[in-house]
Amino acid sequence: MNQTYGRLVSRAAIAATVMASLLLLIKIFAWWYTGSVSILAALVDSLVDIAASLTNLLVVRYSLQPADDEHTFGHGKAESLAALAQSMFISGSALFLFLTGIQHLITPTPMNEPGVGIVVTLIALVCTIILVTFQRWVVRKTQSQAVRADMLHYQSDVMMNGAILVALGLAWYGWHRADALFALGIGIYILYSALRMGYEAVQSLLDRALPDEERQEIIDIVTSWPGVNGAHDLRTRQSGPTRFIQIHLEMEDNLPLVQAHLVAEQVEQAILRRFPGSDVIIHQDPCSVVPREGKRFELS
């Protein structure tokens, strides 16, 4: 799984970097030719895209390194750090967009050749949609937080390019303040996306538990297994592609140690079949010593 994960995540990061570089060149020409503040906003966003995607590429490669003596749980948390860094990059570009929009709202500037801007923005929109579609497929396959953060970033670019098309169309008919108004709206939306991305990254760094549905699947696997009377103290988290799962099994007092170990091994393999690549730790407890208080999961 780790090989497939690494290959897909690396390709997604490289694709994003190449696409952002191509779009930057196109937008530099479009801004120089039209003077549109919305296209300037998109140009600045492409600069941020390149910085964020390059950061993503470097961090993803680092996060894929195997565990070592100093990082016994691996380097997966680097993905969360990349997502947090991206949220900061994006917040900065959103602030620049907002301030530029206010300036041009107060002093609107007529646009040169909005038709050229429309063509360029259409090209950027199509390219970004293709990239987001690929990233969404990679996220579905890998659940990579770094790629998901990048995807959210480029999804906001799709919204931005759509808004720019409308603004350029209105400017073509003489409503020059539309350009600035849409720049303000885009800035607000991008800031919202950045804050949401930063929140998710911080939650991962704080070792938030796996989603409720995944934890319930683990409980269902454990409590339905022959020889297991119940379970307690389920603890989960995720670091990069790896899920970390710890749980205590409750077994009959007179069950031989070898048999208890065999049951625990079978449960572990069942969990790994459902969540490949996980790090699973199972502890066996005799029913008579199981504390009555705390979070317990009994057979139904």
Swiss-Prot record:
Transmembrane annotation, as ranges: 12-32, 39-59, 82-102, 114-134, 164-184
Pfam family, one: ZT_dimer
Binding positions for Zn(2+) per the UniProt entry: 45, 49, 153, 157
Family annotation (SUPFAM superfamilies): Cation efflux protein cytoplasmic domain-like, Cation efflux protein transmembrane domain-like
Localization (cell): Cell inner membrane
Catalytic activity entry: Zn(2+)(in) + H(+)(out) = Zn(2+)(out) + H(+)(in); Cd(2+)(in) + H(+)(out) = Cd(2+)(out) + H(+)(in); Fe(2+)(in) + H(+)(out) = Fe(2+)(out) + H(+)(in)
Family classification: Belongs to the cation diffusion facilitator (CDF) transporter (TC 2.A.4) family. FieF subfamily.
Alphabetical list of HAMAP family matching this protein: Cation_efflux_FieF
NCBIfam families registered for this protein in UniProt: CDF, PRK09509.1
Subunit structure: Homodimer.
Protein name: Cation-efflux pump FieF
Biological source species: Citrobacter koseri (strain ATCC BAA-895 / CDC 4225-83 / SGSC4696)
Originating gene: fieF
